[in-house]
From Swiss-Prot:
GO cellular component labels: plasma membrane
Disruption-associated phenotype: Poor uptake of Fe(2+).
Region described as NFeoB, GTPase protein domain, binds GTP but not ATP: spans on this chain: 1-274
Name assigned to this protein: Fe(2+) transporter FeoB
Cytoplasmic side of membrane: 1-281, 330-343, 404-426, 474-517, 685-690, 743-773
CDD domains from the UniProt entry: FeoB
A Pfam family the protein falls into: FeoB_Cyto
Membrane spanning residue stretches: 282-302, 309-329, 344-366, 383-403, 427-447, 453-473, 518-538, 664-684, 691-711, 722-742
Organism field: Escherichia coli (strain K12)
Effect of G153A: GTP hydrolysis rate 1.8-fold slower than wild-type
Example GO BP: iron ion import across plasma membrane
Recorded consequence of changing R154A: Dramatically reduced GDP release-rate, in construct of residues 1-270. GTP hydrolysis rate 2.7-fold slower than wild-type
Domain topic, free-text comment: Contains a guanine-nucleotide-specific nucleotide-binding site (about residues 1-276) that shows slow GTP hydrolysis. When a non-hydrolyzable GTP analog binds to the trimeric N-terminal domain, it induces a structural shift which opens a pore.
Compartmental location: Cell inner membrane
GN (gene name): feoB
Length: 773
């Protein structure tokens, strides 16, 4: 079979991702485009004659970049297409918005690259009384047009057949430009590098005349002739860029008049009716908060019901199973405990997180695909404008509920570097799925019937602190106003099950692989440091271990937030959590249960793997039956409690160590707000600079320590009023000094707002050699 590389390109909300998932299924690989941290998705699929590599390009409305303030997505798409890596392009077009989508189509066809138009969302178009003549559209465009309903898989086989039959586009003159424009474009094309095809040279010439700033990187000497060409054109027309765009829109209007009845189209009545409520200025925000709470409640509820299968099952396989192998093969006791507690305990920490995190990703994917997330950004626009940000900056922040890494990377969709940078600084405060696992454990141990409310309050606190961080930046080192907010609101539709499953699986797989490696390694090292003293002797009591000795020295620093000296395990959890937040649960589980594991006698004769696995399945089934009972719906944390006996096990020890719900909640505040995990730090450094990464770390530590201290000292004021008053005043005074210093430093850091463009500039410079892909 021949190998074929295809670029998949289209407008945002055209169904491009759904089509990508339909074609490639689970055969996907996610990486980054060279030079920038924009996500690059590739997938594999086969047709009758070809083995296809499908590259999912970022959604974009056009290939023209008028300003360096523009989104990175347009630049990446343009660079890839001009690199020549794609043998064929599939342009996904939204049939219900044909006129707007055809602007990108015309630009692609003018390039002369073989192209197939995938006319998607025909079901939505039909509901709006839109009729499109497919054959007439294909004839006018000079390329195949394949009707699709990607959410239902309709038209996929026809698209694969068109891929096998692909050929050069018919030589149809689509756009009738003014003759002076063509003359100047041809004159620029003559001095461009000869290895660029003639059609692409003329296209680049038109792009330069239109004001595209990145086409000059490909034009060679032609860029030196641009000013003279524009001067000659201005003697004959007012604005060359306007004439070019107008010629394209006239062509699009002529095509639509012939092939469709868009003038008699009817808007979606359902979408219009729902938007009157969802976008209401008074109801919009409460509805958004309710949707977020419902998402959290269902994730905790259903995920908690599935937890026994992963928890009890992993204990049977990786803890008791390893112990059985160790005793059967006569391993030394220390080795058996080390493997069971380190390796087995690490795996047992990762797997129980899967149901709740998976449910969270599933519901996020549902909200994104259904069209609600765009409405959430619109609802939050007024609040974001107060921060000097456009409403669409809230979209990457919402993604942070799943993971902060794509939240940071999602800032690339914003137009201005200042807006990107502010959003990046706010993103780490959004409570990710890994933090949810920590909150659920603490809620079950300390808050009982109020567990759901406690966890929801932490989610809201994260949003509030992100907003306050934005306000702080706006009035200190990042003064400025938001760009006008224009955003397309897609019609509501029911997401395709296959697409939801694939998106959830891709996110969950990345989480498990990333978290699993770190948790297991950390658990093994913690077990080792728990087994030896500072002098190198083996210890029977973890309180005499090297880890305990070192941690006790550091723990007094956290006394103001309610971590007592004998609770050194909590200090270790904070340090390991800097690697990955999910490691906090693994660390506390390993340390709080260490003594119990060492003291327990394991009888290999009584071990029955089948019986333990059956117990896990039975417990899961019972939990699922009870999941939607009224009592569980009112208190979803109980469904995921996982350790019913509070006097024994990790949760019992944790309850004793913290001593009060106030101390536990203060600890959770610190976990929510302090240092981002390593992967988020790396994303911040790549998207902005190391300096801004350092600022994010220091600001997060300050906010976490300050807020946790204020909460705990106010909550425990009656126990030690003098100490509490000193701590409160010290925190307030320190933050006044910090804000004052940031205001004075404003003039020194403005230049750094361009940091997000450095990697793009290098990518653009490398594009002529084909390296920007």
């Amino acid at each position: 079979m021949k190998k074929l590389t295809i670029g998949l390109i289209g407008n945002p909300n055209s169904g491009k991702t759904t089509l990508f998932n339909q074609l490639t299924g689970s055969r996907q690989r996610v990486g980054n485009w060279a030079g920038v941290t924009v996500e690059r998705k590739e997938g594999q699929f086969s047709t009758t004659d070809h083995q296809v590599t499908l590259v999912d390009l970022p959604g974009t409305y056009s290939l023209t970049t008028i300003s360096s303030q523009t989104s990175l997505d347009e630049q990446i798409a343009c660079h890839y297409i001009l690199s020549g890596d794609a043998d064929l392009l599939i342009n996904v077009v939204d049939a219900s918005n044909l006129e707007r989508n055809l602007y990108l189509t015309l630009q692609l066809l003018e390039l002369g690259i073989p192209c197939i138009v995938a006319l998607n969302m025909l079901d939505i178009a039909e509901k709006q009384n839109i009729r499109i003549e497919i054959d007439a559209l294909s004839a006018r465009l000079g390329c195949p047009v394949i009707p699709l309903v990607s959410t239902r898989g309709r038209g996929i086989e026809a698209l694969k057949l068109a891929i096998d039959r692909y050929k050069a586009n018919e030589n149809v003159e689509l756009v009738h430009y003014a003759q002076p424009l063509l003359n100047e474009a041809d004159s620029l094309a003559k001095v461009m590098p000869s290895d660029i095809p003639l059609k692409q040279r003329r296209w680049l010439g038109l792009q330069m005349l239109e004001g595209d700033i990145y086409s000059r990187a490909y034009a060679g000497e032609a860029s030196q002739h641009l000013d003279a060409a524009l001067a000659r054109l201005r003697n004959e027309m007012d604005d060359p860029a306007l004439h070019i765009a107008d010629a394209r829109y006239q062509c699009i209007a002529a095509i639509c008049d012939v092939v469709s009845n868009t003038l008699t189209a009817e808007p979606s009545r359902f979408t219009t009716a729902v938007d009157k409520i969802v976008l209401n200025r008074f109801l919009g925000l409460p509805i958004f908060l309710f949707v977020m709470y419902l998402m959290f409640l269902l994730a905790i509820n259903i995920g908690g019901a599935l937890q026994p299968l992963f928890d009890v099952g992993s204990v049977a396989l990786f803890v008791h199973g390893i112990q059985w192998i160790g005793y059967t093969l006569h391993f030394p006791d220390w080795l058996t405990i080390f493997l069971a507690q380190g390796l087995g305990g690490g795996i047992n920490t990762v797997l129980p997180l899967v149901p709740q995190i998976g449910m969270m990703y599933l519901f996020l994917s549902f909200l994104e695909d259904s069209g609600y997330m765009a409405r959430a950004a619109f609802v939050m626009d007024r609040l974001m404008q107060a921060l000097g940000l456009p409403g669409k900056s809230f979209v990457p922040l919402i993604v942070g509920f799943g993971c902060n890494v794509p939240s940071v990377m999602g800032a690339r969709t914003l137009d201005a570097p200042r807006e990107r940078l502010m959003t990046i600084m706010m993103a780490p405060f959004m409570s990710c799925g890994a933090r949810l696992a920590i909150f659920a454990v603490f809620a079950a141990a300390f808050f009982g019937q109020n567990g759901a409310l406690a966890v929801f309050s932490l989610y809201m606190l994260g949003i509030v602190m992100a907003v306050l961080t934005g306000l702080m930046l706006k009035y200190t080192i990042m003064r400025g106003e938001a760009t006008p907010f224009v955003m397309e609101l897609p019609v509501y539709h029911v997401p395709h099950v296959k697409s939801l499953i694939i998106q959830t699986w891709q996110r969950l797989k990345g989480f498990v692989l990333r978290a699993g490696k770190v948790i297991i390694i950390v658990s093994i090292f913690l077990s080792a440091f728990n087994s030896f003293s500072l002098s190198g002797k083996i210890v029977d009591n973890i309180n005499d271990s090297a880890l305990a000795s070192v941690s006790r020295v550091i723990t007094p620093v956290f006394k103001p937030i309610g971590v007592h000296e004998d609770n050194w395990q909590a200090t270790v959890g904070l340090f390991t959590g800097a690697m990955a937040k999910e490691v906090v649960v693994g660390t506390l589980n390993t340390l709080y249960t260490a003594e119990n594991i060492q003291d327990e006698e394991f009888n290999p004769a009584e071990f029955n793997l089948g019986e333990e696995l059956f117990s896990a399945i039975d417990e899961t089934w019972q939990s699922l039956k009870d999941t939607f009972s009224l009592s569980v719906l009112m208190n979803p944390i109980e469904a995921s409690k996982g350790d019913g006996e509070m006097g024994t096990g990790a949760m019992g020890v944790m309850d004793q160590k913290f001593g009060s719900a106030a101390a536990a909640y203060s600890y959770l505040i610190f976990v929510l707000l302090y240092v981002p995990c390593i992967s988020v730090m790396g994303a911040i450094a790549r998207e902005s600079s190391r300096g801004w990464m350092g600022f994010s770390i220091l600001w997060g530590l300050n906010i976490a320590y300050s807020l946790a201290t204020l909460f705990y000292q106010v909550a425990s004021y009656s126990q030690h009023p003098t100490y509490s008053l000193v701590c409160i005043l010290a925190v307030i005074l320190f933050n006044i000094v910090v804000i004052g210093l940031l205001r004075r430093a404003r003039s020194r850091v403005d230049i750094e707002l361009l940091a997000t463009r450095k990697s793009v500039s290098s990518c653009c410079a490398a594009s002529t050699t084909g390296d920007c892909h």
